[in-house]
Amino acid sequence: MSDLDIQIPTAFDPFAEANAGDSGAAAGSKDYVHVRIQQRNGRKSLTTVQGLKKEFSYSKILKDLKKEFCCNGTVVQDPELGQVIQLQGDQRKNVSNFLVQAGIVKKEHIKIHGF
């Protein structure tokens, strides 16, 4: 009776496999431009654009986006994500169309997140 297999329960991490191959996946994930929406207070929202190539002038892109969509925005330096463009309002579809028409990013390299 002493030959019982007893398994001790341990903490299960569902993302362990995804994080294990992080070194190779990080280079591939940089190819995408992520357009997200963040809820602020009430009906207010914030659109963020992340993952643009570093050789682009973020301030010039922001200036064109603000002029095109009649909204305010800023470029934020994030320690983890790098430079991120923030725009007021839900501008996800507008931003993705603008980036494709301007030739900055191909349509298949844009990922839209939110709601």
Curated annotation (Swiss-Prot):
Probably involved in translation. The keyword Protein biosynthesis applies. PANTHER family: EUKARYOTIC TRANSLATION INITIATION FACTOR SUI1. CDD domains: eIF1_SUI1. This is Protein translation factor SUI1 homolog. Pfam families: SUI1. Signal peptide: none annotated. The keyword Cytoplasm does not apply. Belongs to the SUI1 family. The gene is TIF. Transmembrane segments: none annotated. GO terms for biological process: regulation of translation. Keywords: Protein biosynthesis, Translation regulation. Gene3D superfamilies: SUI1-like domain. InterPro entries: SUI1, SUI1_dom_sf, SUI1_euk. GO terms for molecular function: RNA binding; translation initiation factor activity.
